Every structure is written in structure tokens, then in C-alpha cells.
A protein has these predicted regions:
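Surface-exposed loop/edge segments in extracytoplasmic proteins
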Residues: 15-21, 52-56
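Short aromatic-glycine-(Arg/Gly/Cys) micro-motifs in beta-strand/loop hairpins
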Residues: 1-19
Length: 59
């Protein structure tokens, strides 16, 4: 990953994870995931560059 080391994904209506944003720090990624979950009323998660889930957010 060149832009951000943490991926923020959202669970779309088809129950597929979709890349929503990237962030350089886990703190920013987690905060963004919570905010996105509230705004779009969908579940979100934060992954590291290896694909491990580090945080999840519920609407």
C-alpha cells in the first residue's frame, strides 16, 4: 500500500467488503471507520497491510 498503511472497508448491501479509504495510522483509521459507519449506517472494519482485521465499527 503506497498511500496509507491501514485500509478502511465497509460492508455493502451485497454483504461484500468494499475499500472505502486508507489512513497512515491505526488511530485515524479507527476513528474514520466509526464515523463512516455512523454516516452510511453500515458496518466497517480496519485492516493492516497484511489483511488482518484490527478494528470494527457498527452503525
Amino acid at each position: 500500500m503506497s498511500q496509507g498503511q491501514f485500509r478502511i472497508e465497509e460492508l455493502n448491501p451485497f454483504m461484500e467488503w468494499h475499500l472505502h479509504a486508507t489512513a497512515a495510522s491505526l488511530e485515524i483509521a479507527s476513528e474514520s471507520a466509526r464515523e463512516i459507519a455512523r454516516k452510511i449506517e453500515r458496518r466497517t472494519r480496519v485492516l493492516d497491510e497484511k489483511g488482518a482485521v484490527l478494528a470494527e465499527g457498527d452503525p
